[in-house]
């Protein structure tokens, strides 16, 4: 079993066959420098007869406030959203290209469940988890991140609800954190 400590939260425990810590992987290291990436990819098997889901998870301990009266608040918020966009998109791309064997030795680096993933019907979720964030602060983040990832959602045909922003309380309810 794997647990991941990030941004003041403990994610997991997850089966080591279903969790790929992409941020700390040799695969990510080989793509450096300058490739920002999410923390991990997690296969969440849904109900019987439904396709598997891969949750690509980025964790943060705080976010900028877009409604702040500070002069650079909007710019800071836009930069934050751009960073999360890049991390989630890079993790999606690097994870899928590893699954299809585009990287040398990817099969040896990937957890077992990722090697046989039916990518043509796998559901992908791009997930941001913010520790200690109030529920009422989530909708503006959800909207901004969904807008930033709209091209990705369309080109990858991810479908409605593919971008998810949650706080630690919701993450706990969904079994992401202990």
Residue ranges and their predicted role:
Residues 40-42, 53-61:
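Conserved catalytic cores of phosphodiester-cleaving nucleases, focusing on short active-site segments
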Residues 19, 53-54, 123:
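A residue-level signal for beta-strand positions that form part of recognition/binding surfaces
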Residues 1-38, 45-47, 172-178:
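Basic, amphipathic N-terminal segments that precede the first structured/catalytic domain
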Residues 134-178:
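Polybasic (Lys/Arg-rich)
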Residues 62-129, 133, 150-156:
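Catalytic cores of nucleic-acid endonucleases
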Residues 49, 66, 135-137:
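Intrinsically disordered, low-complexity acidic/polar segments
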